[in-house]
UniProtKB/Swiss-Prot annotation:
Effect of mutating residue 802 to R: Reduces assembly of V-ATPase complexes
Keywords: Acetylation, Coiled coil, Glycoprotein, Hydrogen ion transport, Ion transport, Membrane, Transmembrane, Transmembrane helix, Transport, Vacuole
Subunit composition and interactions: V-ATPase is a heteromultimeric enzyme composed of a peripheral catalytic V1 complex (components A to H) attached to an integral membrane V0 proton pore complex (components: a, c, c', c'', d, e, f and VOA1).
Domain of life assignment: Eukaryota
Source organism of the structure: Saccharomyces cerevisiae (strain ATCC 204508 / S288c)
Family note: Belongs to the V-ATPase 116 kDa subunit family.
Effect of residue 593 to A: Reduces ATPase activity
InterPro entries registered for this protein in UniProt: V-ATPase_116kDa_su (IPR002490), V-type_ATPase_116kDa_su_euka (IPR026028)
Name of this protein: V-type proton ATPase subunit a, vacuolar isoform
Length: 840
């Protein structure tokens, strides 16, 4: 077997393969390909509506089964029953033994079993709900009966309102009905607590105040089966005269969803009613317990198998969706499918299908052939758990064009390094490294956990965070900065005077060179900020120039690979001369200025900003000469940059105008030329597929379908963008200096305002203040300086890669490689997704 291509510098070489699958093994073949996870199928029926495709009925049937399984899962959640998740590795491991899929009869059993269980569970749920309604009704009835004395005796322990003549009602303890009169009637019931005031107000207006209204709060909330919520309710009684008025009261109460009950006014009658209600409740409790036990037993049995059923059904549905992308040869009863696969995986594909055929015990000819095609293949970069995060950073911006240089490879180093320039602090980098190491060392355990969106994002980028922390420790070492303090590792290159007075300004004398990084003697000096600002600002320009230059040379590698000499001559060379003639020259001047001992020469260091401005505004005029013949060099570079603009603008369009000839391009054959005559129907199908493909996309390289005007407009836009971007992108790298300065200053302020204050106390107070302020300092350091500042620096580094770097070479118009592969489907995610789809 040939060694696999690394496919990290450039995308893997892809092959378009065609499958001739006998109908009897089409399902097994699709299962094998799904487990292998290497083939990205092309839709050969893109013009056929979904409901007109061959296997639409099978997909609808499995959709219904998925709905039923989601219903089962919702019942498990409702009854707090945990779903048993079995071993899913057998479905996902493409390198292990072949997974034997469930047969068609087993899938049919799944369908029948799902329908049977759904019907049975619905019946038990309905029965439980009905019993629950009856139970709630009887419990409310019992509460009213138990509150009879409170209702029928006038007391101070209930809320009551009388709109009748107070002379009709005697002192406490007298029966209200007897006091009001023999003709009085009453209505008792239970109503939601938030509707009590509404009921009372409506009755007062309708009956013109001719009523006596009393309520008692039910302490325990009542479960509402319809809304699946607990509600607070009140029991009430309304006294009034006349049967007609009582009927009106009942209608008003029922319109407000009140439950009305018949309550005897005598103590003996209420006692008999209460005994009967208690007996009925006892019977209901027994029935409800039995029904609930039966329902939970069913659900526990379902919980053990539901995940396995769901995985099998979702895979079966995915199989039919893939088969729906194939064409069917009715004459030979075969399915014809096409798909993209990495060319170095062809042997693996043939071997796996051969194993499947041997397992099935059938004898069929080779069912795979590689097609010559002019279609644009998808872009596939091989990644591992370390490189996947960096690759996803670039893929979020755009998918690389097929076989162009992958921006994700250099990003592995440059992304954390650019971050570290802005975040450079050994202490903060160490905290970030510790956090990332905890994720890396426990990745197997965490990988099996259900993770929230934010934590999953951090876990996926754990290696990115690890490198950001390590690089930050490195740049922090160069900056000599650890929690805003310095480290005196080496002997300083500066010597302070031996004798000085407090408040006196003193000047250090240079006695050597600090071995590596910034000298700790600069810390705390008056001109420390001036020095670090100048150093970091120039460093940012140099880092930006280097980053953009090597990115620009990637475009040369792409032009050479695609054999596009006109892009080299018309785009790369003038662009390189323009960028190097201005910003390359500035970078060389920065390094040269650092290398010269201006104090020894006895003259001030020239300002580079004024030099660059005067280079354009006053060519040939030099205020402070940096080096001999500077004026001539700058005039030459300026003229070279000016020549590069029309060069960049005109060469490629003029080359197109004088050399381009319209040619008729015929589509490449998609089948072998020596096909036998008995394959006529298959050839017709393939020809139809090629015709559809020709309409779907314009393929091939070159400028097919473009005219001189299109090329000219494109080149004008490219020239303007390139010239402006050289300026704006170089200035954009100054964010490296700005964020590094802000991070260092914020770290210093935080130290000064918290833990440094604690060092001024002594004794027990000093210990307490040190502990308290250290906790405050550490919490703010982690929350603000590491998390917030780290996120900000990461986003700025992301911007520098997406815009400033990748714009120099990255086309980003590729197609993503999305092979057909079985994935583990989480039930909770599936239910949430279905709910959101239904709501939208």
């Amino acid at each position: 077997m040939a060694e696999k291509e690394e496919a990290i510098f450039r995308s893997a070489e892809m092959a378009l393969v065609q499958f001739y699958i006998p109908q009897e093994i089409s399902r097994d073949s699709a299962y094998t390909l799904g487990q292998l996870g290497l083939v990205q199928f092309r839709d050969l029926n893109s013009k056929v509506r979904a409901f007109q495709r061959t296997f639409v009925n099978e997909i609808r049937r499995l959709d219904n089964v998925e709905r039923q399984y989601r219903y089962f899962y919702s019942l498990l959640k409702k009854h707090d029953i945990k779903l048993y998740e079995g071993d899913t590795d057998k479905y996902l491991d493409g390198s292990g033994e072949l997974y034997v899929p469930p047969s068609g009869s087993v899938i049919d059993d799944y369908v029948r079993n799902a329908s049977y269980l759904e019907e049975r569970l619905i019946q038990m749920e309905d029965a439980t709900d009905q019993i629950e309604v009856q139970k709630n009704d009887l419990e409310q009835y019992r509460f009213i009966l138990q509150s009879g004395d409170e209702f029928f005796l006038k007391g101070d322990n209930t809320d009551s309102t009388s709109y009748m003549d107070e002379d009709m009602i005697d002192a406490n303890g007298e029966n209200i009905a007897a006091a009001i009169g023999a003709s009085v009637n009453y209505v008792t019931g239970v109503i939601a607590r938030d509707k009590v005031a509404t009921l009372e107000q409506i009755l007062w207006r309708v009956l013109r105040g001719n009523l006596f209204f009393k309520t008692v709060e039910i302490e325990q909330p009542v479960y509402d089966v319809k809304t699946r919520e607990y509600k607070h309710k009140n029991a009430f009684i309304v006294f009034s005269h006349g049967d007609l008025i009582i009927k009106r009261i009942r209608k008003i109460a029922e319109s407000l969803d009140a439950n009305l009950y018949d309550v005897d006014s005598s103590n003996e009658g209420r006692s008999q009613q209460l005994a009967k209600v208690n007996k009925n409740l006892s019977d209901l409790y027994t029935v409800l317990k039995t029904t609930s036990t039966t329902l939970e037993s069913e659900l526990y049995a379902i919980a053990k198998e539901l995940d396995s059923w769901f995985q099998d059904v979702t895979r079966e549905k995915a199989i039919f969706e893939i088969l729906n992308k194939s064409n069917y040869d009715t004459n030979r009863k075969i399915l014809i499918a096409e798909g993209w696969i990495p060319r170095d995986e062809l042997a693996t594909l043939q071997a796996r299908l051969g194993e499947m055929i041997a397992r099935l015990g059938i004898d069929v000819p080779s069912i795979i052939q590689v097609l010559d095609t002019n279609h644009t293949p998808p872009t596939f970069h091989r990644t591992n758990k370390f490189t996947a995060g960096f690759q996803s950073i670039c893929d979020c911006y755009g998918i690389a064009q097929y076989r162009e240089i992958n921006a994700g490879l250099p990003t592995i180093v440059t992304f954390p390094f650019m971050f570290a320039i802005m975040f450079g602090d050994m202490g903060h980098g160490f905290l970030m490294t510790l956090a990332a190491l905890s994720l890396v060392l426990n990745e197997k355990k965490i990988n099996k956990m259900k993770r929230g969106e934010i934590f999953d994002m951090a876990f996926t980028g754990r290696y990115i965070i690890l490198l950001m922390g390590v690089f930050s420790m490195y740049t922090g070492f160069l900056y000599n900065d650890i929690f805003s303090k310095t480290m005196t590792i080496f002997k300083s290159g500066w010597k302070w005077p031996d004798h000085w007075k407090k408040g006196e300004s003193i000047t250090a004398t240079s006695v050597g060179t600090y071995p590596i990084g910034l000298d700790w003697a600069w810390h705390g000096t008056e001109n420390a900020l001036l020095f670090s600002n100048s150093y970091k600002m120039k460093l940012s320009i140099l880092m930006g120039f280097i980053h953009m230059t090597y990115s620009y040379f990637f475009s040369l590698a792409n032009h050479l690979y695609f054999n596009s000499m006109i892009d080299i001559i018309g785009n790369f060379i003038p662009g390189l001369l323009f960028m190097q003639g201005i910003f390359g020259y500035l970078s060389v001047c920065i390094v040269y200025k650092w290398a010269v001992d201006w104090v020894k020469d006895g003259k001030p260091a020239p300002g580079l900003l004024n030099m660059l401005i005067n280079m354009f505004l006053s060519p040939g005029t030099i205020d402070d000469e940096l080096y001999p013949h500077q004026a001539k060099v700058q005039v030459f570079l300026l003229l070279m940059a000016l020549v590069c603009i029309p060069w960049l603008l005109l060469v490629k369009p003029l080359h197109f105008k004088f050399t381009h000839k319209k040619k008729s391009h015929e589509p490449l054959p998609s089948t072998e030329a020596d096909a036998s005559s008995e394959d006529l129907e298959a050839q017709q199908l393939i020809s139809a597929m090629d015709a559809d493909d020709a309409e779907e996309e314009e393929v091939g390289s070159g400028s097919h379908g473009e005219d001189f005007g299109d090329i000219m407009i494109h080149q004008v836009i490219h020239t303007i963008e390139f010239c402006l971007n050289c300026v704006s992108h170089t200035a954009s790298y100054l964010r490296l200096w700005a964020l590094s300065l802000a991070h260092a200053q914020l770290s210093s302020v935080l130290w000064t305002m918290t833990i440094q204050i604690a060092f001024g106390f002594r004794g027990f107070v000093g210990v307490f203040m040190t502990v308290a302020l250290f906790a405050m300092w550490f919490a703010l350091t982690c929350a603000v300086l590491v998390l917030m500042e780290g996120t900000s620096a990461m986003l700025h580094s992301l911007r520098l890669h997406w815009v400033e770097s990748m714009s120099k070479f990255f086309v980003g118009e590729g197609l993503p490689y999305e092979p057909f592969a079985f994935e583990y489907k989480d039930m909770e995610v599936a239910v949430a997704s279905a709910s959101s789809s239904a709501s939208s």
